[in-house]
Amino acid sequence: MSYVWETDNLVKEFTLSGGLFKPKHTVHAVQGVSLYQSPGETLGIVGESGCGKSTFGYTLMGLHQATSGSIYMNGRQIDPYVDRKAVHPVMQMVFQNPYASLNPRLTVNAILEEPLELDPKYTPRDRVIRVKEVLDQVGLNMSFGERDAHELSGGQRQSIGIARALIMQPQCIICDEPISALDVSIQVQIMTLLERLQEQHGISYLFISHDLNMVRYISHRMVVMYLGAVMEEGPALDLYEFPQHPYTRALTALNGPVIPHAPIGAPLKGDPPNPLDPPKGCLFSGRCPEAEGRCFVERPPLRDWADRRIACWHI
């Protein structure tokens, strides 16, 4: 099968200056992540704040340059940071904050036409037609095109953000916490819109969120990240109802038991380690109630287990 995108051992590090006469420090934001996405699939990535899930999405999109590893789109290896023209027909992004992601002084028409102006195949008339199409797809009429972004509500702004992502007809849309800044009632509307668009157009979503319930609801497959690495990956509902990795079980414990006798772990305690100095062994060893000997000195690989992959010495 040809995947929409695939990463092989992707690493993203940030170097921080230590100041005058002080050594530099390295933030290990993404640590050797190998993932893929099939056409029409929703892949959810979940984890605590600072786990690297958004950084992974930004690196995949080309907004950060990968430190090492490989990125493939439709089977072709590319560097999204350098070759952004190769990325945009394949992948677009919906950002977390609809108030910050749109220029408040531009009209909706101008915001949506801007990407089309960079493509010579679109004439001015074609651009008008395409803008009308995407507004209709997100449930807004043409009158919204004449309004400035600052005149819109949060839900309307995020709908425009989705329309902007749709305008170039990408295969995949990265949704980075797309509903976390919205009221609950608006969250439902946006989720319903995303599902409808996927049914109509076969779009793939990379859905990034800290909300395990939301990721489970919308995703076909789910990835659990911790301190920049994948802890567990598998079918979303199966992984949610029968978590295996101690970290995944701890996350599900926050939502209460789902199925009687399902393996639910103790709630998380303490804070994640400093990404400037990650543990030498398993990244979760310092907070894991099952950690012992080997866990503290040797990092477990991500191994196949039934229909999922898990990085844990106890499985």
Residue ranges: model-predicted function:
Residues I167-Q171:
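A short, proline-enriched helix->beta-strand linker immediately N-terminal to the Walker B motif
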Residues Y3, S17-F21, P235-I315:
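Short catalytic/signature loops enriched in Gly
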Residues L182, I186-P263:
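P-loop NTP-binding/switch modules centered on Walker-like glycine-rich loops
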Residues D148-L152, Q156:
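Conserved ABC ATPase signature
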Residues L20-K24, I78-Q92, L118, D238-P243, ...:
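ABC ATPase NBD coupling module
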Residues R125-S143, T252-A253:
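Conserved ABC ATPase "signature" region
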Residues M61:
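Helix-to-loop junction immediately C-terminal to a conserved catalytic motif
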